[in-house]
Amino acid sequence: MARAKFERKKPHVNIGTIGHVDHGKTTLTAAITMALAARGGGKGKKYAEIDSAPEEKARGITINTAHVEYETESRHYAHVDCPGHADYVKNMITGAAQMDGAILVVSGADGPMPQTKEHILLAKQVGVPNIVVFINKEDQVDDIELIELVELEVRETLQRYDFPGDEVPMIPGSALMALTALTDNPKIKPGENKWVDKIYNLMDIVDSYIPTPKRNIEKPFLMAIEDVFSITGRGTVATGRVERGVVKIGDSVEIVGLGATKITTVTGLEMFQKTLDESIAGDNVGILLRGIQKTEIQRGMVLAKPKSITPHTNFEAQVYVLNKEEGGRDTPFFSGYRPQFYVRTTDVTGKIESFCTDAGEPIKMVLPGDRIKMKAELIQPIAIERNMRFAIREGGKTVGAGVVGKILK
């Protein structure tokens, strides 16, 4: 079947929901899609369609990163619903890297919780430039002063992690009340329901506060591979978000990392089940590759313009080590420590060979809450470059978040 062509009529922005488990991220995502669908901006999605992680559905915890799309009058959005549960921060790290801005969901009934803080820190570390806050469950709070207290607390937390706490917009509302109204009447009009209007208000603020990103189109093409599958008779497709540059059908690309670098040709491009002639930075796309077997390519490798990025194992980095309250370790670690390094879409075991303070003074051990400069060696080469962000994990905990300062080997 011939695919419809994807039309670029509006600027495209990648956003997502972050925040503590059960504060209402997925409910809000569903409410946004249904509210905008009522105005003609895409198809509404029900909670169950977004929360489609069958193995965890029973516990109501979202594990897989769900992608939905919708439109406001001025923009087209791709929205990732990031996992809220601490064990699934791994997905947050690959998911949050796909955001030009985030909607931080905080329950007005509970205020900021440990994962709220962990997600704000991770958003900072993975380079989410802007945050808008939705104070959810307003219908469960009788006293307006409690909402104001929650706002104050969220602003202080944002400030602590270098977001402009004073200017970040805060919108109170109830995702569940809005979703219930939209489920009862999918054609509801603006002005007919105060809870639905708060969702429109939120999206107006997202439109105006989160700047249309300046895409890295001028830079050489790079896409981190998230998934790989075969299409019978056509070949192997790699999917992911184009991090920078432009790729066209017929271009040569290199497959870099986790093995010998290979070169191949792009024979097809698809986005949201529609074909493209070219794909640009910011697109979530499937790339059909000539002559590549599914076994030769895997999540964690990157597709890149030939000779633009090389695989490395040794680097120096600035790292913030999470304290116990942020979900990190409660004991120190020493040189020779071997955690997992999460880079773009991959995790690789590495060894922390040595470290010193930010100022360069030698230290014997690293305590939770420290900021350090360190040297690391990975067991497999992956595509690494200066200023690239990564996370350090161990046994389901985020131990630290860092940025590459210097490539050593």
From Swiss-Prot:
Recorded GO CC terms: mitochondrion; plastid
Enzyme class (EC, first level): hydrolase
Annotated stretches, region: G3: 81-84
Region (G1): 19-26
Annotated region described as G5, given as residue ranges: 174-176
Residues engaged in binding Mg(2+): 26
Keywords: Elongation factor, GTP-binding, Hydrolase, Magnesium, Metal-binding, Nucleotide-binding, Plastid, Protein biosynthesis
Residues in tr-type G domain copies: 10-214
Chain spans, region G4: 136-139
Database matches in CDD domains: EF_Tu, EFTU_II, EFTU_III
GO molecular function (one): translation elongation factor activity
Major localization listed first in the record, in broad terms: plastid
Entry EC number(s): 3.6.5.3
Sites where the protein binds GTP: 19-26, 81-85, 136-139
Reactions mediated catalytically: GTP + H2O = GDP + phosphate + H(+)
Disulfide bonds: none
Annotated region (G2), positions in chain: 60-64
Compartments reported by the entry: Plastid
Single GO BP term: mitochondrial translational elongation
Gene3D superfamilies: P-loop containing nucleotide triphosphate hydrolases, Translation factors
HAMAP family hit by this protein: EF_Tu_B (MF_00118_B)
NCBIfam families on file: EF-Tu, PRK00049.1, PRK12735.1, PRK12736.1, small_GTP
Family: Belongs to the TRAFAC class translation factor GTPase superfamily. Classic translation factor GTPase family. EF-Tu/EF-1A subfamily.
Entry function: GTP hydrolase that promotes the GTP-dependent binding of aminoacyl-tRNA to the A-site of ribosomes during protein biosynthesis.
Protein name: Elongation factor Tu, plastid
Lineage summary: Eukaryota, Viridiplantae, Chlorophyta, core chlorophytes, Trebouxiophyceae
Gene behind the chain: tufA
